[in-house]
């Protein structure tokens, strides 16, 4: 981790976690910098922290009063960083561990929403290997990784135009 910028406000010390090592690193850096700029205008002591593998050490050294979580995708939104912050006893902005983990898992989220009476689009889970020889549907469909954020790994497939092997080989390794 790297402390990217520290401001000298009078208020609480806020560490803005950004960057990280997910596929959404770049957008997280932009979000984190925007959050930092907004907080600086409000009398906070802002510490910009690019969350790398030494994030535990850096947070332990910096001892912020609170962490503003601007991490995106895996590790930032899946309950991992939330669990780490709870273990370190550092308050943070974001949903808790369980809510984050459930929200990041598309299949479990869909199950919870459906069982709560909320309408959801039709869908089912398929392994990447299930796309090697045939299409699971005859009409156009969307493939999305079960545990990525934003539009990472989203593919629109037209079975009439895209051979199954090409679809499977074009899929990133983030699909199982």
Regions found by a protein language model. Name each.
Residues 113-114, 137-156, 174-176:
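ATP-grasp fold ATP-binding core
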Residues 98, 126-131, 146-150, 160-163:
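Short acidic/polar capping segments at secondary-structure boundaries
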Residues 1-115, 127-134:
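ATP-binding N-terminal substructure of ATP-dependent carboxylate-amine bond-forming enzymes
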Residues 46, 120, 152-176:
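Conserved ATP-binding module of the ATP-grasp superfamily
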Residues 128-132, 141-143, 171:
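Intrinsically disordered, low-complexity boundary segments flanking structured domains
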Residues 11, 63, 135, 139, ...:
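Intrinsic-disorder/low-complexity coil detector
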């Amino acid at each position: 981790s790297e402390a990217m910028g520290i401001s000298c406000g009078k208020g609480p010390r806020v560490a803005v976690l950004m960057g990280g090592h997910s596929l959404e690193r770049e957008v997280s850096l932009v979000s984190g910098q925007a959050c930092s700029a907004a907080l600086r205008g409000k009398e906070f002591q802002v510490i910009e922290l690019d969350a790398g593998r030494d994030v535990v050490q850096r947070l332990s050294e910096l001892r912020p009063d609170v962490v503003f979580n601007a991490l995106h995708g895996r590790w930032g939104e899946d309950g991992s960083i939330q669990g780490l912050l709870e273990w370190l006893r550092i308050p943070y902005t974001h949903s808790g561990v369980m809510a984050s983990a459930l929200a990041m898992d598309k299949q479990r989220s869909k199950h919870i929403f459906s069982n709560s009476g909320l309408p959801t689009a039709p869908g089912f889970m398929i392994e990447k290997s299930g796309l090697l020889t045939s299409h699971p549907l005859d009409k156009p469909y969307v493939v999305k990784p079960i545990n990525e954020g934003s539009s990472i790994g989203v593919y629109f497939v037209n079975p009439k135009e895209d051979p199954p092997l090409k679809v499977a080989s074009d899929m990133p390794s983030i699909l199982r």
